[in-house]
């Protein structure tokens, strides 16, 4: 469980070894996490088969996230810059709007991960989107991918893929944004996994049409 601020936290997945499943250990883990985060609103991405269990605890479905994968094929695009060249306060403000909660300490570390690339889109002198591509167990993952418009998201996707060309790359897209799905399909990405985004006290007010990729299934 990650506490982002006084009002919001996010649950990662619970993994119980097969021989211990069905004995209540998973529910106990959830209860410990709930105690840890207190009265905050909680978000999570439930894997198939787990949504009903979380609903019994008061969580409600918001939308589906689908992970798409492809071989990274991209190119540099105009107006795309290293995100660290942009004043951090601007990046943090943009992220807060699109994530639904301030996560300043987390964000500073996220965009500075080793062997990762964080890029921003500048339009008319201001930040109009950003994305991060980071190494994972198999290739790379893009997340988050936030942008004011589909063409900006496309430019960011291409520029991020250019940095890791030829490697497997994944993008976790909210299905509630049809333009996010269209981006994945346009670049011939294939769906490989899905999860249900759920919240305990209601979904934060989010510009869903600007969210093309969530940060991760484990972190929100």
Predicted stretch roles:
Residues 39-48, 55, 60-73, 191-203:
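Conserved catalytic-core motifs of GNAT/GCN5-like acyltransferases
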Residues 29-33, 49, 68, 80:
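Amphipathic alpha-helical hairpins
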Residues 47-50, 176-177:
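Short, polar loop motifs at secondary-structure junctions
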Residues 53-54, 74-77, 182-184:
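Short loop/helix-cap segments at secondary-structure boundaries that form the rim of catalytic
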Residues 24:
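Conserved G/P- and acidic residue-centered "switch" motifs that form tight phosphate/ATP-binding loops
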Residues 6-7, 12, 17-21, 31-42, ...:
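Intrinsically disordered, low-complexity, positively biased terminal segments
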Residues 69-86:
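Conserved N-terminal entry element of GNAT/NAT acetyltransferase domains
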């Amino acid at each position: 469980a990650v506490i982002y601020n006084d009002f919001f936290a996010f649950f990662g997945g619970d993994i119980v070894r097969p021989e211990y499943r069905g004995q209540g250990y998973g529910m106990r883990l959830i209860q410990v996490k709930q105690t840890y985060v207190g009265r905050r609103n909680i978000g999570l991405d439930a894997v198939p088969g787990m949504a009903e269990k979380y609903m019994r605890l008061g969580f409600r479905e918001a939308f589906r996230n689908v992970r798409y994968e492809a071989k990274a094929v991209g190119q540099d695009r105009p107006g795309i810059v290293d995100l660290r060249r942009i004043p951090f306060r601007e990046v943090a403000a943009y992220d807060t709007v699109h994530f639904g909660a301030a996560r300043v300490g987390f964000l500073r570390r996220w965009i500075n991960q080793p062997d990762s690339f964080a890029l921003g889109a500048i339009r008319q002198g201001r930040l109009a989107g950003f994305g991060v591509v980071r190494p994972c167990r198999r290739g790379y993952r893009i997340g988050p991918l936030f942008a004011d418009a589909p063409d900006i998201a496309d430019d960011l996707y291409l520029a991020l893929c250019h940095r890791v060309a030829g490697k497997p790359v994944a993008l976790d897209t909210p299905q509630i944004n049809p333009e996010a799905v269209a981006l994945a399909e346009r670049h011939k990405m294939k769906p490989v996994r899905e999860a249900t985004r759920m919240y305990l006290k209601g979904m934060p007010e989010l510009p869903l049409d600007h969210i093309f990729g969530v940060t991760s299934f484990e972190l929100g």
